[in-house]
From Swiss-Prot:
Domain of life per record: Bacteria
SUPFAM superfamilies: Epsilon subunit of F1F0-ATP synthase N-terminal domain (SSF51344)
Cited CDD domains: F1-ATPase_delta
Protein name in the entry: ATP synthase epsilon chain
GO (cellular component) term, any one: plasma membrane
Coiled coil: none
Subcellular location: Cell inner membrane
Species per Swiss-Prot/TrEMBL record: Helicobacter pylori (strain G27)
Length: 123
């Protein structure tokens, strides 16, 4: 299976870069998945969790909002704010707390925020 290149960038710098099997993005019209060979598109992202599947694990990045450019072989994400939640990390609890704060500050839509927060807590 061909791998997709992905980069997640915020104004302060790069949050994540790598080659992945798939990525699920929180689009403003709903979540959508991207695999290698996807049609080209540019879309707006809402507050949510980017789900990244690598060859041997799943990784998650919480964002408050941003843009994604998708091409056949790569996904470039420019977010206003992002927190990389590493599954096997000593600062995981701190990352989850920062992600919750980022999302709570991102939207006044309490229902949408609580849904994303529940997703983060289940990671």
């Amino acid at each position: 299976m061909a791998l997709l290149k992905i980069s997640v960038v915020v104004p302060e710098g790069e949050v994540y870069t790598g080659e992945v099997k798939s990525v699920v993005l929180p689009g403003v019209e709903g979540e959508f998945g991207v695999l290698y060979g996807h049609s080209n598109m540019i879309t707006l992202l809402q507050a949510g969790v980017i789900e990244i599947e690598t060859e041997n694990q799943k990784e998650h990045i919480a964002i408050n909002w941003g843009y994604a450019e998708v091409t056949k072989e790569r996904v470039d994400i420019l977010a206003d704010g992002a927190v990389f939640i590493k599954k096997e990390s000593d600062d995981r609890d701190d990352a989850i707390s920062r992600a919750k704060k980022l999302l709570e500050d991102a939207s006044s839509d309490r229902l949408a925020v609580s849904s994303v927060l529940a997703k983060i807590e289940s990671l």
